[in-house]
Amino acid sequence: MTRALCAATLVIAPVALAATPAHAVTTCQVNGVTVNSTNVVGTAGSDRITCGSLAPGDQVSGLGGADYILIGGSLGGGAVVRGGSGQDYVQVNGTVGPMAQVLGEADGDFIRTGTNLGAVNGGTGFDLCRVAGGNPPVNCEA
């Protein structure tokens, strides 16, 4: 009986672990350095951050300074791009997926996206936001 319980535990344990979702790693360039992470973070100063698509749940944060953030593809559901403080330029060439967010945050920002199925929010300051279609941006003055 002990062997049967042990064998059953070995069979059930991997199945239980496989049910836990994992985030895919996003590959970006931050100021010319390759970063592979689910949470890509810039510096307190001005940054140039370029990425392909963001996997569901992944995040890119510019932090302070006048950041240039370019996502060449789409944002998966729940992915977040944060400009941070400073006058940021944030562009998402593809679709902003459901539950995904593009946040300009503090100061005046320029945000441009493809179709917005999530949320585009300019934040505080005078923000210029352009979305190709879908949900309209909020907290954008122009």
Write out the residue ranges for each language-model feature:
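Extracellular/mature segments of secreted proteins
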Residues: 32-39, 59, 136-140
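Glycine-centered beta-turn/loop sites at beta-strand termini
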Residues: 32-33, 42, 51-53, 61-64, ...
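Secretory targeting and sorting signals
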Residues: 1-24
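Extracellular beta-strand/beta-solenoid scaffold signature
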Residues: 76-78, 98-99
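Extracellular, beta-strand-rich repeat scaffolds characterized by small/acidic residue-biased motifs
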Residues: 44-46, 53-55, 64-66, 73-76, ...
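Extended, small-residue-rich solenoid/repeat segments and analogous flexible loops
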Residues: 21-45, 49-50
